[in-house]
Structure formats: C-alpha cells, structure tokens
Amino acid sequence: MDIKQQRAIDRYVGVPLCWLLSGVNRIISNEPDGVPPKKILVILLSEMGSLVLAHPMFVRLKQQYPEASIHVLMFAKNREVLDLMNVIPPENIITLDDSGFKSLVKDSLKAIFTMRKLKIDAAIDCELFARISSIFSYLSGATFRVGFHRHTQEGLYRGTFINRAVTYNPYRHLTQQFLSLAAALESDTTPANKLLPEPYTGKTPVLEFPVEELLQTTRDLHNFFPPIKEKKLVLIYPSGGILPIRAWPLKYYCQLAKTLLDEGYAVGVIGLKGDRAVAQQVVDFCKDPACVNLAGYTKSVRHLLAV
C-alpha cells in the first residue's frame, strides 16, 4: 500500500476503532497492578530510521527490567534493520505485511493472537501519529499502555485508553522522546514523565562486517563502475522516499554532487529502483563518469551499508 492508502485506512478505520475501544476500556478497565512488567512489547511500525533512534530506549528497558523479555511489533519490510542492530532476539519479533489491505488484516489478526498468547504486560507505542499502533497496544492485552497523547494540544485522536500517556514535544530529539516512553512505565504524573529523561551515555552501535564481505562488495562495485575505482566515494539520496518533503530541492543535490566531484570525490546516487529517474537527473547534470546511478543497485540494507 502507498502512503495515501495507509493514511485513509488509519483515519476511516482507525478513528471508529479508537472510539469503540475507548468505550470498552471505560467499562472494562484493566489498570496496572504495580508489578514490574515481565513481557514488554515495543510497537515501531513504519519508520526504518526510528528503529535506529530507538536503540537507546531498548538498552534502557533492558537496564530497567533485566528479567523482562522484550518483543517488537513492526512492518516486515523494516525487519532487516532491527536484525542488523542485534538488540532483540529474532524469535521475539512480530511482523506485519503492509503490501496490501488483505495481507495487513491477515497479519494483524495473527499478531493479536500471538500477543495475547504471550500475555504481554506492557506495550510501548512509539508511533507519533498513527492510530493503528495505539489499537494494537490495547488489543495486545497489556495493562501498561504507554504512548504519545495530545492531551490539551492539537493532534490526532488516538483514543483514551493509553494509561501512561506522554506528551509529544517537537523540541526534543526523537531519541529523548523514546527514552521518555521507557521512563513513563514507572511514572505517576499526568501527563506521564513530564521531565527530561536521564541522558543516554552508552555507546553508539557499530555494525561490523567480515573483511572478505567488504572486499567482495568493493570488487563488485568497481567492476560495475570502473571510473570510481581510485576515488573516495560519497553517497547521496535525493529522493526523500514516501515523504518527498524531507528532501532538498533536486537542484541542491545536483550542486552538491558537482562540488564533491570538483574536489576529487566519486559520487554515488542511491535509492530504490523507483528512484532511478530522479538519480539519473543528478548524473545527467554532473556529466562526470565518477558520478554514478546506484538507485536499485544494492540488494539490501546490509549491502548498502557495506558499499
């Protein structure tokens, strides 16, 4: 499904479900009993980048609850990133196929059954605006339900069943926001955890590759694109993906690529297969054999990182 379809489903299906579940929660409320959670579910569906930024939160949860098992609910297309981070056991990852409406519904029902079977104690909804994630947090059966809430601010209606509601603060880095969600499990204020969380001082994870894998990746790249062989390679991503507003205007990428080439670097324009046309515009502007179109060249996130 594309982003417009996802938003439509989230609005026209999500709002009634949030309203219905809020009513159910008022009648049948399962409040936390104060016992530290033994099984924690983290819901991080849509953003590949958010998974990386959530690393400190995963570390903090393991520190706060060393006896607890941590599970993750996410879209299947983003799983590779979480596997590369190596913070969650593979068997604790629950995935949803969002390529179509039928597959999403089918996997959602499976996920709800799995979460109920696991007897989740706490659900941490890391999505900023989506309603589907808050619905999953309630249907997981968790008594602790942590998530962002608009409170008195403007924002999307996500129901009233989040019992550890955290105010989203656009002036804080997203890593701090995620740490606030972890801290909210033990918060007794309303909104939950209004203070800055304790700073994360741990090390940034580094992905290590076998030497032979890196050498083979380099050989393959140079065989495909001989002009870049003797140069340092800089990768740029001009597309913006499903949210083009994130990207600079294309002319800025063209100017950046030209400047890098003039300084002696090779430039690789990356992206998915669908981004090849945009990448080619940068290549055509530069008119330099050391500027190459790598959109669709890499086979996986790991392959891209190895490049």
Placement of each model-derived feature along the sequence:
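Catalytic machinery of carbohydrate-active enzymes
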Residues: 1-307
